[in-house]
């Protein structure tokens, strides 16, 4: 999708409408390797063939959806006047109906990012009955699967190209990197409370150009 696209189109390509072979809870799947234990996937499709449903959503997001049961969860960044609304959504994977669509953070003015990035690029992490979403320096949040905000946290650091780091859960920790223009670091938050458990500096400055 080009950066001039004014909607986020979510296509579900399924050969069997009755169910799913397994959850897809994080970036690149259950193990983070991009492998799926699914057989008989469709090898061909077109604008009409093998499309169960198609949904257009306003905004632009490079994040991937995550799947738990028959529910899809995704993030979005929707322009709103001079600002940007940073949102999380739950979509029924069988019908395409939007169950809920919540604003979690708001940018009063759109910060500068790389022209190929979006303000909602990190993929959410689905951990049992909790959803973790990350918008870089704009904020990190934990939600129930019903859309209730459990906690929100924000680390104020100057981005260079915008965020692209998808968070991961390991034990009781939510992990992500914060690679900004100064003091880049790896953060570990208590996944239950959002409190910082530790912060480790990274000796890796983000390049101004690439």
Q: What kind of region is each of these model predictions?
A:
Residues 1-5:
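Positively charged n-region of N-terminal signal peptides that target proteins for export
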Residues 20-210:
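Noncatalytic, solvent-exposed loop/strand surfaces
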Residues 8-18:
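Bacterial N-terminal signal peptides
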């Amino acid at each position: 999708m080009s950066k001039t696209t004014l909607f986020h189109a979510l296509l579900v390509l399924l050969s069997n409408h009755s169910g799913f072979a397994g959850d897809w809870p994080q970036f690149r799947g259950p193990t983070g390797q991009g492998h799926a234990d699914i057989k008989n996937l469709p090898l061909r499709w077109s604008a009409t063939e093998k499309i169960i449903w198609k949904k257009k959503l306003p905004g632009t997001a490079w994040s991937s959806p995550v799947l738990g049961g028959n529910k899809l969860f995704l993030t979005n960044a929707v322009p709103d006047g001079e600002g940007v609304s940073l949102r999380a959504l739950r979509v029924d994977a069988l019908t395409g109906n939007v169950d809920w669509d919540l604003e979690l953070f708001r940018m009063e003015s759109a910060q500068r990012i790389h022209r190929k990035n979006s303000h909602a690029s990190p993929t959410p992490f689905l951990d049992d009955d909790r959803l973790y979403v990350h918008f870089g320096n704009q904020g990190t949040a934990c939600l129930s699967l019903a859309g209730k905000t459990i906690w929100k946290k924000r680390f104020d650091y100057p981005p260079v190209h915008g965020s692209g780091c998808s968070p991961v859960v390991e034990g009781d920790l939510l992990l992500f990197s914060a690679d900004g223009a100064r003091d880049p670091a790896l953060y570990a938050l208590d996944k239950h409370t959002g409190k910082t458990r530790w912060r480790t500096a990274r000796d890796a400055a983000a390049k101004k150009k690439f």
